């Protein structure tokens, strides 16, 4: 078995044509603000930027082919502007993260990670940190199951649309 990073469905198909081992992982950038994988499915038939399919329906493809998506840069803003946690660019999202974090008695980092883990695609998180406490906060997300309402509230608070 092996995995790839940032591959679209047709790239995966082409690669699988020439290798014997099954491809089981695709690493992609994914966070609450950087969630085009979800947006293009939510905004189908809408005249919005999120409706544009930039990845060839990668989320659906991976789910249909039992390929695990691994989210890299799970706390990153779009355009590599840094971490969205505590950023002035996402006041509504950070406020909502704080409210939900207080409910579960965890950090906003934990809730941001739990948001990724709550998606039915059973995504995994790839993160790097030199902070033991931050790593513990991320690991704590495995014990939190956000409600659907909380998941969508965070999605909307990041500026995404629903039909």
Question: Where on the chain are the PLM-derived regions?
Answer:
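Beta/alpha (TIM)-barrel catalytic core signal, keyed to glycine-rich beta->alpha loops juxtaposed to Asp/Glu
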Residues: 1-163
């Amino acid at each position: 078995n092996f995995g790839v990073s940032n591959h679209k469905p047709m790239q995966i198909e082409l690669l699988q044509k020439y290798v014997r081992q099954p491809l089981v992982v695709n690493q992609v950038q994914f966070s609450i603000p950087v969630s085009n994988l979800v947006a293009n499915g939510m905004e189908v038939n809408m005249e919005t930027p999120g409706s544009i399919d930039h990845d060839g329906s990668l989320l659906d493809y991976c789910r249909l082919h039992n390929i695990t998506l691994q989210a890299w840069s799970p706390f990153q803003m779009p355009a590599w502007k840094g971490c969205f946690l505590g950023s002035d660019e996402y006041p509504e999202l950070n406020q909502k993260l704080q409210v939900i974090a207080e409910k579960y008695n965890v950090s906003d980092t934990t809730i941001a990670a739990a948001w990724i883990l709550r998606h039915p695609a059973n995504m995994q998180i790839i993160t790097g940190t030199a902070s033991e406490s931050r790593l513990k906060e991320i690991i704590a997300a495995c014990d939190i199951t956000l409600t659907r309402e909380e998941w969508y509230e965070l999605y909307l608070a990041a500026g995404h649309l629903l039909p």
